[in-house]
Amino acid sequence: MNILGISAFYHDSAAALIVDGEIAAAAQEERFTRKKHDAGFPAHAVEYCLAECGLDLKDIDYITFYDKPLVKFERLLETYLAFAPKGFRSFVAAMPVWLKEKLFLKDMLKKDLALMAGISKQDLPPLLFNEHHKSHAASAFFASPFDEASVLCLDGVGEWATSSVWLGKGNKLIPQWELDFPHSLGLLYSAFTYYTGFRVNSGEYKVMGLAPYGEPKYVDLILDKLIDVKEDGTFRLNMKYFNYATGLTMTNARFANLFGGAACKPDSTVTQREMDIARSIQVVTEEIVLKLCNTVHKELQTDYLCLAGGVALNCVANGRILREGPFKDIWIQPAAGDAGGAIGAALTTWYEYLEKPRQISGSDCMSGSYLGPKYTNEGIRQYPVSYTHLRAHETADVIAYAVFCLKRGGGGGG
């Protein structure tokens, strides 16, 4: 049984191939196109996965997409109606791509797949759609080494959910509760990413990396004005300070006044203020995540926790969960963002749609995340032929040679 999972059309497009329940191959489209966070149809990633397993598209039994576009469109419409007439410009900007493409995503996917395989749309395998947060949860739990675990998914937004809790048992994921848009820890962090001059859905790691250089001067301000955090970790944002629900920017003038100036321009010089802001939102994020983990443990009483969603890429917060949290161990999906949704979509089809049993081997199913293309020595030798500025250097002790190059202060070769 061969199942192809696809994540696409938002950011970090990817494909994953499950063969008889095993993750046989997975890759992000950006690795092939060299376009950072490539959001297009992952044709190259799909082709790689099929080639890696010696399969054609006609050998695939099911194709599963990682979210449900029509439910997402429902959220967009309800949000615009709730805030109307505010957000009209954003509505006008968003509608053409939905009316032209995204509302017909099922047909668009079939068209792209059929064109790639050189077959008719009628000859394609069944196309399924999985809920966004369930794809995240499945990528975390079904790939983990645990037979039973709590699952916490935190991201910007899927269809409606921004935070969700699941109980994983064997081959089942049981939904517990969720927080919905616009109240989102991921979007709160992205708002500060935007405000400090970095790119949303790309530069969040820079904010995390900037945080140690600052002081948490704005923590109380954030908690007092921007977000109401309950003791159990659940929260609500004060949308008076944000623009992402209906606007073309993440924050507004009221937010700027709160922090003493307009949002930084991209590539502008980072000042101590931005460092302090980064430290402050990082501290707030960590405290919320820890509270949520304590609540999840109290409610579900499991020894283990699985994490996914873009917020689970915050390794500093993850470290605190491991050190200070109530769980014996945690497991984080390495591709915790939307790319990993391709894996989760395919695994959901295998375990829940097809009801296949799940065998626990004591280790995870990610093969050390070595699921993408691998290169032979002969293949590597061919690169200098195409790129004249590269030189090949062969050595029996790669580590010793790398240390030598680093000490010398230059690259290899010679």
Outline where the language-model segments fall:
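Short acidic/glycine-rich loops and adjacent helix/strand connectors
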Residues: M1-R391
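Short stretches within intrinsically disordered, low-complexity N-terminal or propeptide regions
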Residues: I18, E394, V398, A402-F404
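Conserved small/polar residues in nucleotide/adenosyl-binding loops
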Residues: T388-T395, G412-G414
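Acidic-residue sensor for enzyme active/binding pockets
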Residues: E286, E394, K407
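Hydrophobic alpha-helical segments, chiefly the membrane-spanning helices
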Residues: A400-G414
